[in-house]
Amino acid sequence: YMFTYKVEFMYSNEKFIIRLGNPGKEYIKNRHNIGFLLLEYFSEKYDSKFTLKNKLKSWYSEFKINNFTYRLFMPNTFMNNSGNAVRAIVDWYKIDLDRLFIIVDDIDLPLGKIRFRKKGSSGGHNGLKDIIKKLQTENFNRIKIGIGSPPVNERNKTLNTISHVLGNVSSKESLTLDRVYKKLIESLIELNDKNEDYIISELNSFHREENL
């Protein structure tokens, strides 16, 4: 009983932020790896380096602000197997899923549009689909960042979608996303049990065009 209490106390003032994507240098700037770019931005801002943690199947970094610890994870698994890493992280830290934030790309949202959901289906996203399967629940926070739709190609929609998500973020898109990352980081740091509804509402109504 004491051990359980200690674990709950230890991690109540922490946030676990996991980005989904594909490992390997050739994928780093892909639209599918938009969460990777966010965590890179996060770690550079707070001067925290990533190291590989094999038991967690992830690259890991952490930093503290006002006695609050932020644990950042970049799974070393491919997108379709994201659940293996997320399950390993959840089991190792024995965390409450309220403290878990999954960052993913969303092809159905305009570039830079944010959608924060506390639960829900995968929406056709293979990474989320695998996490739901491995955790056996849809009740976890996910923050979707829009990457925009691919140009219309009626002859081969599937191939068109794949080439879009695996295509690199352009320099123009990066300017928009930098502002989105800044807003997201500020919001994740401010987020607490008392202001949660307000922060989520603010993120979901954030207009990236107005901040260009």
Where are these regions (language model features)?
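Intrinsically disordered, low-complexity regions enriched in acidic/Ser/Thr/Pro/Gln residues
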Residues: 165-168
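Phosphate- and other anionic-substrate recognition elements at nucleic-acid/protein interfaces
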Residues: 122
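Nucleotide and nucleotide-moiety/phosphate-recognizing core
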Residues: 3-118, 129-144, 150-163, 174-209
